[in-house]
């Protein structure tokens, strides 16, 4: 670890933030700057409901959060940009096994296994598309779906 400056101050000079460099070079540079604690944190995905979001991001160095409220999505991004040493973006995940059920006002569908027994692939596809559109509008990158249970 050789760099203790904030991401905003050095974005132009850090190789891992340079989109013109090959991905492998950027990754090697970023990994060389990370502490063991930061590397372990990047492998964790923690539930953001009711917890201290800043603690998860700044102290636990999480790489991913799930079950995040609309308000917390922008707060999480701001925390990463302003309070973390390397500014590694979060991956936002959520369970979307019957629609975007953690988002107030989203469309709720039967479980995927329940929809499968309808033998109507077009309706199942339409439900998946509707869920994908609702989820993508909220900043979620990763859904845990489909499932077989």
Where in the sequence are the language-model features?
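N-terminal beta-rich core of secreted/periplasmic extracellular enzymes
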Residues: 2-149
């Amino acid at each position: 670890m050789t760099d203790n400056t904030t991401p905003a101050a050095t974005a132009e000079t850090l190789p891992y933030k340079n989109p013109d460099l090959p991905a492998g070079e950027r990754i090697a540079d970023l990994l060389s700057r990370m502490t063991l604690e930061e590397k372990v944190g990047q492998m964790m995905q923690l539930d953001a409901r009711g917890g201290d979001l800043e603690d998860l991001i700044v102290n636990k160095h999480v790489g991913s959060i799930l079950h995040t409220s609309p308000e917390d999505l922008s707060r999480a991004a701001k925390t990463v940009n302003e309070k973390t040493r390397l500014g590694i973006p979060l991956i936002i995940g959520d369970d979307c096994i019957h629609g975007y059920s953690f988002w107030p006002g989203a469309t709720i569908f039967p479980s995927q296994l329940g929809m499968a027994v309808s033998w109507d692939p077009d309706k199942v596809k339409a439900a998946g598309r509707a869920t994908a559109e609702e989820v993508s509008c909220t900043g979620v990158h990763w859904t845990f779906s489909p499932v077989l249970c």
